[in-house]
């Protein structure tokens, strides 16, 4: 049998990292088994579903490299199929019309709460007579449709992640609403548990891989599979992604959508790699840096943890840093140019390309995210700098003015500054000031960049020298040094 899995996001928001991680596990399992990965958009929430969210979901999956084999299918196009299934359940006597009002149901919940009982529907309209139904209709009530759940029914399945799972029918909240209110003889808008099962049957889904927050839906869905004459698929409920405090990661935690991570400068392969590690342990010898294709070769449910996976920003940044360092120089520059343009930095992409290339190579080793190149690169796109407190302190050292005066006087006029020339100037300036080379380099860095920490000093000096910006910066720093020393 060909393995068929599906991702079924709701377009009520941008692609969430939890949904994306579910997509990763589905994709890995499908590729591992030579199966099919199906994309289905669950857009039955008419009030909250938006086309722009659908577009965001599709773009996010494609950016991550999670290509699908079928779809996207849209549930809003399949309403007739769901209504046929509901009619089948009505005809079999497995579903019925319920005329309870919202006020009656709220009163029932309040009564149960007062008694310390779990809220559940008491199935009071399961056996209405035709006369009782007619009376409710005459009173202007429109019924929902409920699916019968027997309290004494035990539902079990062998979860591919969690092992044997068992639920009692009495714990499922009573008979389940499967269609919204509509006049009798009509079938209202179908609801989640019903449409999911109908689609999974129609699409031949063999394995349902989803987050553990869906585990309470599974027994209800198993009953629906059986009622519709279908064999339930395999189920795998993966651990939730947790925040730093051990709670489920949510929008309140800030960055949670794939488009947010992308905007922050995380690379798609790095993010996909990290999401794979959120709950899955690679076998020995694979390491923590791997492609999706490599992970697919080794993927198994046995290596998925049952406990929640805590989101670790340091780990993500470390992974992203490795992937940034692996980028080819031209590929890396292509990533940075749009960011620099978006930041408003002035340059001519064609004329300045060699200079931009050198700048990109200077920054590449020190970046955790691509977006850090905006701040770290800023000092190279402006003719002058502002000295931070540490730079001011360095320029205030007794010999800084002597160092800067020597460098200014002997600065080469030609546009090319070689490493040898720069090193010689630093050594000579140190000798003239009677200080060590390290102190001279700290003073030079403070003058050129406005800070005492940063990327390779010689490469930074060469880049600034190409634009002729080292001379005015040295002059400004000398003036500052003479004022404070």
UniProtKB/Swiss-Prot annotation:
A motif ('HIGH' region) lies at residues 9-19. The keyword Chloroplast does not apply. A motif ('KMSKS' region) lies at residues 248-252. SUPFAM superfamilies: An anticodon-binding domain of class I aminoacyl-tRNA synthetases, Nucleotidylyl transferase. It is an enzyme of class 6 (ligase). Pfam families: Anticodon_2, tRNA-synt_1c. L-glutamate binds at residues 6, 192, 210-214. Transmembrane segments: none annotated. Its EC number is 6.1.1.17. ATP binds at residue 251. Does not require zinc. It comes from the Bacteria. It catalyses: tRNA(Glu) + L-glutamate + ATP = L-glutamyl-tRNA(Glu) + AMP + diphosphate. GO terms for cellular component: cytosol. GO terms for molecular function: ATP binding; glutamate-tRNA ligase activity; tRNA binding; zinc ion binding. Keywords: Aminoacyl-tRNA synthetase, ATP-binding, Cytoplasm, Ligase, Nucleotide-binding, Protein biosynthesis. Monomer. Non-discriminating glutamyl-tRNA synthetase. Catalyzes the attachment of glutamate to tRNA(Glu) in a two-step reaction: glutamate is first activated by ATP to form Glu-AMP and then transferred to the acceptor end of tRNA(Glu). Acylates both tRNA(Glu) and tRNA(Gln) with glutamate, but has 13-fold higher efficiency with tRNA(Glu). HAMAP family: Glu_tRNA_synth_type1 (MF_00022). NCBIfam families: gltX_bact, PRK05710.1-4. Belongs to the class-I aminoacyl-tRNA synthetase family. Glutamate--tRNA ligase type 1 subfamily. This is Glutamate--tRNA ligase. It comes from Thermosynechococcus vestitus (strain NIES-2133 / IAM M-273 / BP-1). The gene is gltX.
């Amino acid at each position: 049998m060909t393995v068929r899995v599906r991702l079924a996001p709701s377009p009520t928001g941008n692609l969430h990292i939890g949904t994306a991680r579910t997509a990763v596990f589905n994709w890995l399992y499908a590729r591992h088994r030579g199966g099919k990965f199906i994309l289905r958009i669950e857009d039955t929430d008419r009030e909250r579903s938006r086309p722009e969210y659908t577009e965001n979901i599709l773009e996010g999956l494609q950016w991550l490299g999670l290509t699908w084999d079928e779809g996207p299918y849209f549930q809003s196009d399949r309403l007739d199929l769901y209504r046929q299934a509901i009619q089948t359940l009505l005809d079999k006597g497995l579903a019925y019309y319920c005329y309870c009002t919202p006020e009656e149901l709220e009163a029932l919940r309040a009564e149960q709460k007062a008694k310390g009982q779990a809220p559940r529907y008491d199935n009071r309209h399961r056996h209405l007579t035709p006369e009782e139904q007619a009376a409710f209709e005459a009173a202007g009530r429109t019924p929902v449709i409920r699916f019968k759940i027997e309290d004494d029914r035990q539902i079990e399945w062998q979860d591919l992640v969690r092992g044997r799972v068992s639920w009692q029918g009495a714990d499922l909240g009573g008979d389940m609403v499967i269609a919204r209110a509509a006049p009798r003889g009509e079938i209202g808008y179908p609801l989640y548990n019903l449409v999911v099962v109908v689609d999974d049957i129609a699409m031949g889904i063999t394995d349902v891989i989803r987050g553990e927050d869906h585990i309470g839906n599974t027994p209800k869905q198993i009953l629906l599979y059986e009622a519709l004459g279908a064999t339930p698929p395999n189920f795998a409920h993966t651990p939730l992604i947790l925040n730093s405090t051990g709670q489920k990661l949510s929008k309140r935690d800030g960055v949670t959508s794939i488009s947010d991570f992308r905007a922050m400068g995380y690379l798609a392969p790095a993010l996909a790699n990290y999401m794979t590690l959120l709950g899955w342990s690679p076998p020995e010898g694979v390491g923590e840096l791997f492609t999706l294709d490599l992970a697919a070769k080794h993927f198994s449910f046995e290596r998925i943890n049952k406990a929640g996976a805590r989101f670790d920003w340091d780990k993500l940044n470390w992974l992203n840093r490795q992937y940034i360092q692996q980028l080819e120089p031209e590929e890396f520059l292509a990533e940075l140019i749009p960011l620099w343009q978006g930041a408003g930095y002035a340059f001519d992409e064609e004329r300045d390309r060699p200079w931009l290339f050198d700048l990109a190579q200077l920054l590449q080793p020190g970046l955790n995210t691509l977006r850090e190149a905006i701040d770290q690169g800023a000092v190279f796109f402006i003719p002058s700098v502002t000295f931070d407190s540490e730079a001011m302190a360095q320029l205030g050292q007794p010999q800084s003015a002597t160092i800067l005066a020597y460098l200014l006087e002997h600065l080469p006029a030609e546009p090319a500054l070689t490493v040898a020339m720069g090193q010689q100037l630093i050594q000579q300036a140190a000798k003239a000031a009677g200080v060590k080379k390290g102190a001279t380099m700290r003073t030079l860095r403070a003058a050129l960049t406005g800070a005492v920490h940063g990327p390779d000093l010689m490469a930074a000096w060469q880049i600034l020298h190409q634009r002729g910006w080292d001379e005015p910066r040295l002059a400004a720093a000398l003036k500052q040094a003479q004022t404070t020393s």
